[in-house]
Amino acid sequence: MKSYECPFCKRVFHRQEHQVRHIRSHTGEKPFECSYPSCKKRFTRRDELIRHVRTHLRKALVTPEQTLDVNLHKAPDSKPEGDKSTGQEADKSQNQSKDGSITDPVQAAVLALSVAYAKPTSVSLSPTDLQAQSKLIEKPRRRSASNATGSLNKKNQDPLRRFSISESAGAAAPTPSPSNSKSPPSENRKNRLQNVLSPIASNNVPDFNQNYPTESNPMFLSTPRFQNTNGQRTLTVPVSVWDARQPPTSSRSGLPLSVMYNHFPSVPIPPATVNDTSMEYYLPNAYPHPTGISLPFYPFDSGIPVSPNIPVSPSSSFVPMYPTTFPSSKPQIVNAPPAPSYFSPGSSFGAQLCANGSTLLRADTKQYGLALPKITNSNLISPNQTFNPVKSSVKALPTLEPPSSPSHATATSSLHTLFHTAPSRSYD
């Protein structure tokens, strides 16, 4: 990136105008002078000059009756009412003095503001020069017919022009009038427009295809549709909107159409088999997996926690909760009452549940879709019977008893007895 250094303070700037503005702070140069009459202030920066000239314009708009400090000659109050030219000449003489300087404060402020906004050039413009230029701009510019034709001929020399010189001259022939400007286009303009559009129409532009997707054209629809053809219902199943279109009559590659378009968009269905089941087969399946699902068998010793009252190995009376094959893709939810993970001897809920012969389902095995075996009548528990639990692999831990006398230092059961395999006990 190019840098600009100040020769006085060695300050570096990235833009040259910033360097020039900074150097003026060292030299004290003020190149921007206020061009408002009777104001000789100078400024270092252009934005400061513009801000200053705006104050002159604001004061002139607020108090327009105040005039500048120049030789001002007011027009006499007595003016003939019928002579308007004398009044206009008096206004001009009021705005300008004998030496040609502007005496109207508003006009002088506007001209000074335009000078402040103007870019610096080699030739400085005075307020009188700016006033002369503004008068030239206000004059209406009227071109003759020859100048208009010459400009059209220059434009027509461009090779990118689509119209010929004669057509352009014919377009410029009508004179602008209020009636012609609002009239509709003439016949020659329509002919020229048609000539311009003819090369576009001559190209190989395909015509509009009337076979757009509608109810009358089911071949162009992306959803399956039923049709009755010769007393037989046909289900139209297009692969996609693009593939379901009519195949072309000719093949560019030379291959037969049966090889190129080997898909068939229509599947015939006998009328007797059209029901809800067949519709589920032919319609798109919302589930990506197949409809038939076979669940594997999970043994109880595969890491799933079991209750002490349930045998570890599966018995012959094991009844699965779900069938091996589902009739549909959606799994059926079995509403089974939640069962506790253990059954106490005095629990009437467990006895009643077992007496009904229903399948027990623990809460921790519900997410795996497993069912527990039915408990037979031989294992029923009642409050009046003695508790005879099923032999389990989980050993009962002895309870810690408090010492019988204060002289004993330890309890009756130690850590060795907690982790030692106790012999099996039998209950009479």
UniProtKB/Swiss-Prot annotation:
What do we know about what induces or represses this protein's expression?
By glucose starvation.
The family line of this record is: Belongs to the creA/MIG C2H2-type zinc-finger protein family.
Under the heading Pfam families, the entry gives: zf-C2H2 (PF00096)
Could you state one GO cellular component term attached to this entry?
mitotic spindle
Alphabetical UniProt keywords: DNA-binding, Metal-binding, Nucleus, Repeat, Transcription, Transcription regulation, Zinc, Zinc-finger
| Gene Ontology terms describing biological process | regulation of transcription by RNA polymerase II
Q: Which PANTHER family match?
A: REGULATORY PROTEIN MIG1-RELATED, ZINC FINGER PROTEIN RSV1
**Compartmental location:** Nucleus
Query: Where is region (Disordered) located?
Result: 67-103, 133-190
Q: Where is the composition biased (Low complexity)?
A: 166-186
The protein's role, per its UniProt record: Involved in maintaining cell viability under glucose starvation conditions. May have a role in regulating genes involved in gluconeogenesis.
Q: Where is the composition biased (Polar residues)?
A: 145-154
UniProt GO molecular function: DNA-binding transcription factor activity, RNA polymerase II-specific; RNA polymerase II cis-regulatory region sequence-specific DNA binding; zinc ion binding
**Feature: compositional bias, Basic and acidic residues:** 71-92
Report C2H2-type zinc finger ranges.
Answer: 4-26, 32-56
Which gene name does the record give? rsv1
Please identify the protein, giving its name as recorded.
Zinc finger protein rsv1
Q: List the disulfide bonds.
A: none
